[in-house]
Curated annotation (Swiss-Prot):
The keyword Nucleus applies. Its main location: nucleus. It comes from Oryza sativa subsp. japonica (Rice). This is Probable histone H2AXb. Variant histone H2A which replaces conventional H2A in a subset of nucleosomes. Nucleosomes wrap and compact DNA into chromatin, limiting DNA accessibility to the cellular machineries which require DNA as a template. Histones thereby play a central role in transcription regulation, DNA repair, DNA replication and chromosomal stability. DNA accessibility is regulated via a complex set of post-translational modifications of histones, also called histone code, and nucleosome remodeling.
């Protein structure tokens, strides 16, 4: 009367495959690894079951957001490969990401192109005759 393999008992049957917590949550980021890091980091005495899943989801969302914007920046520059410069442009041109990563320095990222308003040429309606005659009057 014992169940040999797939019967009505509790627990796993012998033929069942283990399913990762990442796949259960529908995530690409590793839930188990993040749980291990949370436990080893001594951030708290105990770590709840949902905490690493939630943190994995947040990290995956942020990574996807940055990669999407960096891919757009690479495409705008007619490149197929994302380099640190594209990540820098993506982060600094997005208001929320720029605020979140304000104190972060991206290696080989460069700076945003910016020319101060006072250094730009004036858009006045003067023609060339007016410019030359004004400097000659004493």
């Amino acid at each position: 009367m014992s169940s040999a393999g797939g019967g009505g008992g509790r627990g796993k049957s012998k033929g069942s495959k283990s399913v990762s917590r990442s796949s259960k949550a529908g995530l690409q980021f590793p839930v188990g690894r993040i749980a291990r890091y949370l436990k080893a980091g001594k951030y708290a005495e105990r770590v709840g079951a949902g905490a690493p899943v939630y943190l994995s989801a947040v990290l995956e969302y942020l990574a996807a957001e940055v990669l999407e914007l960096a891919g757009n920046a690479a495409r705008d520059n007619k490149k197929n490969r994302i380099v640190p410069r594209h990540i820098q442009l993506a982060v600094r041109n997005d208001e929320e990401l720029s605020r979140l990563l304000g104190a972060v320095t991206i290696a080989a990222g460069g700076v945003l192109p910016n020319i101060h308003q006072t250094l730009l040429p004036k858009k006045g309606g003067k023609d060339k005759a007016d410019i030359g005659s004004a400097s000659q009057e004493f």
